[in-house]
């Protein structure tokens, strides 16, 4: 057990000062995730809330602390320079004028009543400008607190940019905040030949480089500049102290209305282009920064979205299919009762939704997984099998090859009256499922109760912004996992733009896409969503390599704008 394992909250509450890291939610520590899971209140800037909220329990109160997002007109606290902050109590159901407090008062107010408060800050609490003041306020108010360190941007961002700060020779490393650095500080780091990590803003990089040159650094000293570090919006430029201003202008980064964005600049030989080109592991991911549309139900999209993120992509889940109960539930009710009374030898699940439908009926009747005792269970696909295991049922049969109805039939044993006391199979399925499994089981000698367990209907249209992005080329790729997702997406949102890469799970889905005027760029080698994601990543890797070999910049598909609409492929 960790020595920092959470104790019961004291009467006056408990505050955890938590480092949220530089931006990638995957960089949160195990201790941070534990603290977030037990929090009653989250206190943080909006961008930090976006990083930590996925690990918080449902119903946690969120308190944004940035006045730009909450109320740009809020004044500073008198005499402190600290912005006054809106208190947003997520436990309140009434709408009223929020109180205005400084950060310390906000944390204290959130801790009242014995609540666990997580005060999340970007990077590490030890480097936050106001965290120490808030800790002292906790001491004065008798509120216990703890500190959960996080990865500081000055360390995490260079690692994601492919710039190691030290090597075997143990070179000196200096960290400078350009906003507060004194002339003496610049003189000291300028006289050193070690690596310098500068925290600054995009429009102040050139000025910081000038300070280092004035202090003695050579103008040809290598320099990297990274913006939005550790996120899929990360961009890194390589230059020298003397050329950084010109490099950013040529890249059309400056001048920019976003010049105030924070950046991390690394000065020294570790930033040399020859070395960084080999070590830039993050930005060289096959689909880095790609916005990928995943038109599926939210329940089905989670694992696929995680896989896409591992390739550097930004998945955007758009439900195209909604699941509803059958219009006439009596058939389903009789079948579930038949499971209990011994009517079936087998039950076959072909989707997660089928498992969910049966489970809901079980719960309605007060049943649980024990009702499957004596019944053989089959499942198509890893996700369906996982849903059964989560229910407490381990499937007896999963296709050894193709994860489809056809694959299940190939492995299904024929009915044998000697070994099979019952000849009937319960098949709960969607109202639009194919008849492949039913026909195959009948051919093997089984009787099949083919029962509509749920209906699939077209989902509501996505927000207007998403529809415009689909039709206007805002997405780099779209993944179609069935013919119905093609038809439904086009029906509720319109046809994807011609620059969007179209990826399909199999020939039938590809044929439907072509019938809708889309050219299919990627097709999975086998009908699996994860194989489809792998195929799309391979496509992205080949595309990236081709650009590098041609001496062209690596761009995303959405950064191209050819005039002609994509037509159906004739090859």
What are these regions (language model features)?
Residues 126-145, 159-163, 359-363, 490-493:
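Short Gly/Thr/Asp-enriched flexible loops that form oxyanion-binding sites at enzyme active sites
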Residues 14-18, 115-121, 173, 194-198, ...:
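Generic beta-sheet signal
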Residues 49, 69-82, 147-158, 171-183, ...:
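Conserved beta-alpha
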Residues 1-148, 342-354, 372-373:
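Class I S-adenosyl-L-methionine
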Residues 39-41, 61, 195, 477, ...:
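Well-ordered beta-strand positions
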Residues 183-226:
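Conserved anion/nucleotide-ligand pocket segment
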Residues 25-28, 126-132, 151-157, 204-208, ...:
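Short glycine/serine/threonine-rich phosphate/pyrophosphate-binding segments
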Residues 108, 112-115, 126, 130-140, ...:
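Active-site/ligand-binding-proximal alpha/beta "capping" segment
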């Amino acid at each position: 057990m960790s020595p920092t394992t959470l104790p019961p909250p004291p009467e006056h509450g408990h505050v955890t000062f938590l480092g949220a890291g530089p931006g990638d939610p995957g960089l949160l520590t195990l201790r941070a995730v534990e603290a977030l899971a037990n929090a009653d209140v989250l206190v943080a800037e909006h961008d930090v809330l976006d990083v930590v909220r996925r690990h918080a329990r449902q119903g946690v109160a969120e308190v944004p602390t940035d006045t730009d997002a909450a109320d740009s007109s809020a004044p500073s606290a008198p005499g402190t320079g600290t912005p006054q902050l809106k208190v947003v109590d997520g436990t309140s159901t009434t709408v009223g004028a929020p109180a205005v407090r400084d950060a310390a008062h906000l944390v204290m107010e959130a801790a009242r009543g014995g609540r666990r408060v997580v005060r999340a800050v970007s990077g590490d609490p030890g480097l936050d400008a106001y965290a120490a003041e808030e800790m002292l306020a906790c001491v004065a108010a008798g509120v216990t607190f703890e500190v959960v360190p996080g990865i500081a941007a000055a360390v995490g961002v260079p690692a994601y940019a492919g710039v190691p700060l030290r090597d075997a020779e143990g070179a000196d490393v200096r960290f400078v905040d350009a906003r507060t650095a004194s002339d003496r500080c610049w003189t000291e780091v300028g006289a050193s030949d070690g690596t310098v990590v500068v925290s600054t803003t995009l429009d102040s990089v050139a000025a910081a480089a000038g300070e280092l040159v004035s202090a003695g650094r050579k103008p040809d000293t290598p320099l990297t500049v990274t913006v939005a570090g550790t996120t899929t919006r990360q961009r890194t430029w390589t230059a020298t102290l003397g050329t950084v201003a010109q490099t950013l202008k040529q890249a059309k980064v400056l001048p920019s209305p976003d010049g105030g964005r924070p950046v991390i600049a690394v000065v020294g030989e570790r930033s040399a282009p020859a070395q960084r080109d080999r070590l830039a592991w993050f930005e060289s991911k096959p689909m880095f920064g790609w916005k990928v549309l995943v038109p599926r139900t939210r329940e089905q999209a989670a694992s696929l979205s995680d896989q896409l993120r591992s390739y550097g992509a930004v998945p955007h889940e758009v439900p195209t299919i909604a699941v509803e109960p059958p219009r006439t539930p009596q058939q389903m009710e009789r079948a579930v009762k038949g499971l209990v009374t011994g009517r079936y030898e087998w039950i076959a699940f072909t989707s997660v939704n089928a498992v969910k439908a049966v489970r809901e009926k079980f719960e309605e009747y007060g049943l649980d997984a024990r009702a499957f005792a004596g019944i053989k269970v089959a499942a198509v696909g890893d996700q369906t099998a996982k849903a059964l295991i989560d229910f407490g049922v381990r499937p007896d049969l999963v296709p050894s090859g193709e994860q489809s109805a056809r694959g299940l039939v190939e492995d299904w044993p024929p009915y044998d009256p000697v070994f099979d006391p019952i000849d009937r199979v319960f098949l709960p399925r969607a109202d639009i499922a194919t008849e492949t499994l039913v026909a195959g089981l009948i051919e093997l000698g089984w009787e099949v109760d083919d029962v509509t367990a749920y209906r699939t209907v077209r989902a509501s249209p996505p927000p207007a912004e998403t529809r415009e992005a689909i039709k206007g080329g805002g997405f780099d790729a779209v993944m179609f996992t069935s013919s119905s997702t093609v038809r439904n997406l086009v029906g509720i949102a319109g046809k994807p733009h011609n620059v969007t890469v179209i990826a399909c799970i199999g020939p039938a889905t590809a044929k439907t896409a072509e019938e809708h005027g889309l050219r299919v760029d990627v097709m999975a080698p086998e009908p699996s969503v994860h194989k489809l994601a792998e195929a799309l990543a391979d496509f992205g890797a080949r595309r990236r390599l081709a650009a590098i070999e041609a001496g062209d910049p690596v761009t995303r598909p959405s950064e191209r704008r050819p005039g002609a609409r994509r037509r159906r492929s004739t090859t």
